[in-house]
């Protein structure tokens, strides 16, 4: 069986075409894609104003998110487990704060009802009996 000669022209064309695709594709994408400043200039003035007003807030939210990720990644547990535990703790803290707020509102309502009836305030009556 006779060995086929190596087709240098075919491999050269393939390498050139592959290089053009590998380098040219991302280069074309970068050339066509507008920058953030160009997009911002295309906004109408109201959207530009709103975007500028919310910029600091969005940057702060992103910084908080990154800091939480850094803090959570220091744990030996998987990050999704740590985030789930943190969410449970946040929900628990929110429910505690809500119950404290409800207790304060209840106390304020009781005080208002006592004042309407003409009874002395509860805190004042407890101080005089001691």
Curated annotation (Swiss-Prot):
It is a single-pass membrane protein. The keyword Cell division does not apply. Essential for the assembly of ubiquinol-cytochrome c reductase. It has a direct effect on the correct occurrence of the Rieske protein, core 4, core 5 and apocytochrome b. Keywords: Chaperone, Coiled coil, Membrane, Mitochondrion, Mitochondrion inner membrane, Transmembrane, Transmembrane helix. GO terms for biological process: mitochondrial respiratory chain complex III assembly. This is Assembly factor CBP4. PANTHER family: ASSEMBLY FACTOR CBP4 (PTHR28202:SF1). Its main location: mitochondrion. It comes from Chaetomium globosum (strain ATCC 6205 / CBS 148.51 / DSM 1962 / NBRC 6347 / NRRL 1970) (Soil fungus). GO terms for cellular component: mitochondrial inner membrane. Belongs to the CBP4 family. Residues 93-118 form a coiled coil. The keyword ATP-binding does not apply. It is found in: Mitochondrion inner membrane. It holds the Pfam family CBP4. It comes from the Eukaryota. The lineage of its organism: Eukaryota, Fungi, Dikarya, Ascomycota, Pezizomycotina. The chain crosses the membrane at residues 7-29. Residues 111-130 are annotated as: Disordered. The gene is CBP4.
